[in-house]
UniProtKB/Swiss-Prot annotation:
Signal sequence coordinates: none
Cysteine disulfide links: none
Domain called Acylphosphatase-like: residue spans: 5-92
The gene coding this protein: acyP
Protein name: Acylphosphatase
UniProt key word Hydrolase: yes
Active site positions: R20, N38
InterPro entries: Acylphosphatase, Acylphosphatase-like_dom, Acylphosphatase-like_dom_sf, Acylphosphatase_CS
SUPFAM superfamilies the record matches: Acylphosphatase/BLUF domain-like
Originating species: Chloroflexus aurantiacus (strain ATCC 29366 / DSM 635 / J-10-fl)
Family to which this protein belongs: Belongs to the acylphosphatase family.
């Protein structure tokens, strides 16, 4: 099955609400590779690489996030998959 890669930026109240941990857990369950991190401007940034259905499901989840989050915007940039991402991790 073909791989896809999405570079995603999530805005709103998305830091301090376990967004990264929930994203990591959901990505691992879906066997999606990549990473997630907080940005200094208050957004969360993530790279998802996996099958199209799995990546699209993760992106859809980002629109709501964990129950404590208040997502205002999700920006998705589709990129060429690299095949080099490992197990999904939180980048510090």
């Amino acid at each position: 099955m073909d791989l896809v890669r999405a570079h995603v930026f999530i805005s709103g109240r998305v830091q301090g609400v376990s967004f990264r941990a929930y994203t990591r857990d959901r990505a691992r369950e879906a066997q999606v590779k990549g990473w997630v991190r907080n940005l200094s401007d208050g957004r969360v940034e993530a790279v998802f690489e996996g099958t199209r259905p799995a990546v699209q499901k993760l992106i859809s989840w980002c629109y709501s996030g964990p129950s404590q989050a208040q997502v205002e915007r999700v920006e998705v940039h589709w990129e060429e998959p690299t095949g080099k991402e490992g197990i999904f991790t939180i980048v510090w």
